[in-house]
Amino acid sequence: MTHAGMPYEFQVTRHVEFSETDLAGIMHFSNFFRFMESAEHAFFRSLGFSVTGSRSRIAVCLPRVHAECDYAVPLRFEDEVLVRLLVERKGRRSLTYQFRFCRLNGSTPEEVARGRLTVASVELQANGGMKAVPLPKVIANYIQQAPAHMLVDGFRAKVNSSPARERRRRERPKRAIRTPSRNGHHKTN
């Protein structure tokens, strides 16, 4: 685990475990969300906080209100993965993180997926409900939003045009296109 000394960036490295893969030996998509949550918790611990109010100086909870992940290249059993967290947005009552997943097996890291997670600051109510509240000052004063040049712009577009995906697209054989002619018969281009 590394904390870059900046309260907007964190990275953790881990390996894909056998129990995290499917029958094809590929990491199940749901585990990307587990990796994101685990990185968020490690980020908070590195800053001296906990994401649960019961074990920290924070009197609120931070439930997930939005989660997404775009996949470019599958991860497999025993792949080494770097999970990088950046604070994309710090709102008055929420935090949004960007995640980048890079496979570290080769000589150069390969980005395999990108994720985004938004958490809201809430106070638990006696009736079991939740009430949105401002981020605690201890968090709001410490955690910062990452500089714009570090954030991914065009979130989906860039992960879908990863070098690996572009290489596979170029290597794919061209398919014949069938179009109807004027007389109703199909011709192949």
Residue ranges and their predicted role:
Residues F29-H41:
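Conserved N-terminal beta-strand and adjoining loop/helix that marks the start
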Residues T2, P7, F44-G48:
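Binding-site signature for planar aromatic cofactors or substrates
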Residues F43-L95:
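Hydrophobic beta-strand-centered segment that forms part of the acyl-chain substrate-binding groove
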Residues T2-H3, F10-V12, Y71, L75-E80, ...:
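HotDog/MaoC-like acyl-thioester-processing domains
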Residues H15-E17:
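Beta-sheet-rich sandwich/jelly-roll-like modules and their strand-loop junctions
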Residues N183, K187-N189:
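Asparagine/serine/threonine-enriched low-complexity, disordered tracts
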